[in-house]
Amino acid sequence: MVEEVQKHSVHTLVFRSLKRTHDMFVADNGKPVPLDEESHKRKMAIKLRNEYGPVLHMPTSKENLKEKGPQNATDSYPHKQYPANQGQDVEYLVTGTHPYPAGPGVALTADTKIQRMPSESAAQSLAVALPSQTRVDANRTGPAGSEYRHPGASDRSQPTAMNSIMETGNTKNSALMAKKAPTMPKPQWHPPWKLYRVISGHLGWVRCIAVEPGNQWFVTGSADRTIKIWDLASGKLKLSLTGHISTVRGVIVSTRSPYLFSCGEDKQVKCWDLEYNKVIRHYHGHLSAVYGLDLHPTLDVLVTCSRDSTARIWDVRTKASVHTLSGHTNAVATVRCQAAEPQIITGSHDTTIRLWDLVAGKTRVTLTNHKKSVRAVVLHPLLYTFASGSPDNIKQWKFPDGGFIQNLSGHNAIINTLAVNADGVLVSGADNGTMHLWDWRTGYNFQRVHAAVQPGSLDSESGIFACAFDRSESRLLTAEADKTIKVYREDETATEETHPVSWKPEIIKRKRF
């Protein structure tokens, strides 16, 4: 069906074309709205009243500001006079410890220090700029002050209203005073860490690491689907555990029982009895890969996080799922537990951190400051604070409500892991194989490490997936993409003189987040 076009007369078409031309070239749609004089006057009057109301109508005395002939009246603001100026406008000589010339570029001489009194039109501005009575008294009685009055003149008296304004009206002016900018506190000196040992044995990426409470051995999980137990002192392999059918993503050793817990990309969470070296419990419920796990320090509770956007709380003994913590909109990459509230902290690929109520199984606080995935969270062992790692920044927070403390900028990579010890050394490991060490209190980056990959590995397989301090905090262990575990320890020969703190105080920028 063809739609009929309505026909118009030539007269109508011409005038429509003319209107379009006027709208394009003559119309004033883009011009600013003309100024309304009446509203502009009211606006200026209100501004004057608000800003200058207290001093807008000051009482001025013409006799005190201008006089003819000899000294026939008391000068309200006394100055010394020249006797040669009898019968003329009185000229004043301002004397004191800091004389000023009459204008810029004028040499400072006895003549150029003479200033003529202001005219009546300038009297108002002079009255506003008068000093307070307290300041005049201090100048008059000070050791280097000058006498600003005529011989025999009475003490300077100022109107009561002016006194109250100048003495109490410093509220607005206080914002104009220069305040000392806060500076970064000096960081504590920490000895540098150096590579001590490289342990090889896994056939795939080493994805997780944990040290047992007795500090005798440590355990690692790998992409080769095995869990290996190593002697901490010698670095020798003690035991290999097989059972997972995909990459092992998390391991942890219980402090309350001889159990080892592991999780992997096969959706399985296993409990291993280390007396028999076999699996005694499975925890079923996650719908996708399990990325991390942690044990509650005082309760028999296990918490796991998964790619299915949930974290689950398990009863260790009964294998029952106590709570399913739902709220994240993407994979939950890391989880941490503590005895104090909030007892569970999760970080997710949806860029948020959530603090959970363990009893209710609900979110207490959601932190949205990060702009990219949060892959690592670490709790300080002594302070009531924690840190989170993301490709945009490392951020420090304080419990219980997640108050922001500071940013630790400079590690420009995807941060996979964080670790901190009681001395305040924070370690961040990234996917490009770099490891940065920070002072926890000040956020000062005192060392950067990029260890060489194991011979035979590709350079692209340089990456740190996990790191942990041993129980004595004298050794740092890293799980890396070149299929090795690297052990670092402090350089015992280093001193503050050989490795000084390169501390350059900066003005701290007040950042919102």
Curated annotation (Swiss-Prot):
It is found in: Nucleus; Nucleus speckle. Residues 60-79, 136-160 are annotated as: Disordered. The keyword Cell membrane does not apply. Keywords: Acetylation, mRNA processing, mRNA splicing, Nucleus, Phosphoprotein, Repeat, Spliceosome, WD repeat. WD repeats lie at residues 201-240, 243-282, 285-324, 327-366, 369-409, 410-448, 459-498. GO terms for cellular component: DNA replication factor A complex; fibrillar center; nuclear membrane; nuclear speck; nucleus; Prp19 complex; spliceosomal complex; U2-type catalytic step 2 spliceosome. Pfam families: WD40 (PF00400). InterPro entries: G-protein_beta_WD-40_rep, Prp46/PLRG1-like, WD40/YVTN_repeat-like_dom_sf, WD40_repeat_CS, WD40_repeat_dom_sf, WD40_rpt. The keyword Repeat applies. The modification N-acetylmethionine is found at M1. SMART domains: WD40. Transmembrane segments: none annotated. It comes from the Eukaryota. The modification Phosphoserine is found at S119, S200, S390. GO terms for biological process: mRNA splicing, via spliceosome; positive regulation of G1/S transition of mitotic cell cycle; protein localization to nucleus. Identified in the spliceosome C complex. Component of the PRP19-CDC5L splicing complex composed of a core complex comprising a homotetramer of PRPF19, CDC5L, PLRG1 and BCAS2, and at least three less stably associated proteins CTNNBL1, CWC15 and HSPA8. Interacts (via its WD40 repeat domain) directly with CDC5L (via its C-terminal); the interaction is required for mRNA splicing but not for spliceosome assembly. Component of the minor spliceosome, which splices U12-type introns. Within this complex, interacts with CRIPT. Also interacts directly in the complex with BCAS2 and PRPF19. Involved in pre-mRNA splicing as component of the spliceosome. Component of the PRP19-CDC5L complex that forms an integral part of the spliceosome and is required for activating pre-mRNA splicing. As a component of the minor spliceosome, involved in the splicing of U12-type introns in pre-mRNAs. Belongs to the WD repeat PRL1/PRL2 family. This is Pleiotropic regulator 1. It comes from Mus musculus. The gene is Plrg1.
